[in-house]
Amino acid sequence: MKVSEYATEVINSRPYKYQTRQTFFKDLKRLGIWEMEVENINSALIRDVVEKIQTQSTRKRLFITARSIFKDLGICQDLPNLEAEGKIYDIPTQAELEWLIDKSKYRLQLLLCMFGGLRVGEACAVTPEKLSGDYLDVNQAYSQDGLHLGSPKTYGKILLPHWLAEEVRNMKPNQYWKIGRTTKLVSHSCYKLSRSAKFKDMTGGKTVNPHMLRHWYATDMIRRGVNPEVVRRQMRHKNVSVTLRIYTQVRSEEIEASLPTRLDEMKKPLETPVRALRLVK
């Protein structure tokens, strides 16, 4: 039996979410085993393909796919469970991000990512009916291809800034997302605007995607000293370690500031201020 036949049967018989099923199909094709016979699949074959991929998150996901699909056959179960990679983004300033969002046709969806921490599929599924006061019930998400409206990656009620809740409350019918409309439209709009000459001049060539806005949201709360448990709830993470490990944005200058300084270097900048104080005295 070919992997395509076996995998289709397995995936459709398990209670996977729509987006998870689509990801499994895509991953099996990326691994290059879609048309192979199941009896020829083994861990060494999967490793040879995955180890050529540079992105840690992609390697991790492909190993998960192989272990999941073939677990009933006992194949690929010795593939490693890689550590999640914490991303470090060089995110533009808040003013620059808001400038970009205001230029987008999908302004409301991007605002929900930046000031509500929503994933792009969740932002597309927002309607006024999901509001209770300024609390938003995140209970649905569109799949990336736009063909399915189902459950989000994580459920939860989050508190929106009042002005943003008002924007959601006043949504017009033409702002509602519809089945068949891919959420990539939001991502492409965001990326295209960040590649414009004006934005390049403003930021020095930084690019932006909707998930970076979600990172900004978490990072901004943590930098303002918001309790990590509150951040976790607003981000709808299953545990606070995910909040701190993966979604805390650390700028390059903060890393540099954390490095120890030699005593000889510390004395130099102190000489001038000390003399100045003595003169005043």
Place the predicted regions along the sequence by residue.
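Short, aromatic/basic-rich helix-turn unit that serves as a nucleic-acid recognition element
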Residues: 1-27, 51-58
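Basic, Lys/Arg- and aromatic-enriched nucleic-acid-binding interface segment
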Residues: 56, 78-120, 124
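Conserved tyrosine-mediated DNA breakage-rejoining catalytic core shared by Y-recombinases
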Residues: 91-94, 125-168
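C-terminal catalytic core of tyrosine-transesterase DNA break-rejoin enzymes
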Residues: 107-111, 115, 121-122, 212-238, ...
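C-terminal secondary-structure termini that scaffold catalytic or DNA-interacting sites
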Residues: 151-157, 162-164, 170, 260-281
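Active-site/catalytic core of tyrosine-dependent DNA strand-transfer enzymes
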Residues: 160-205, 217
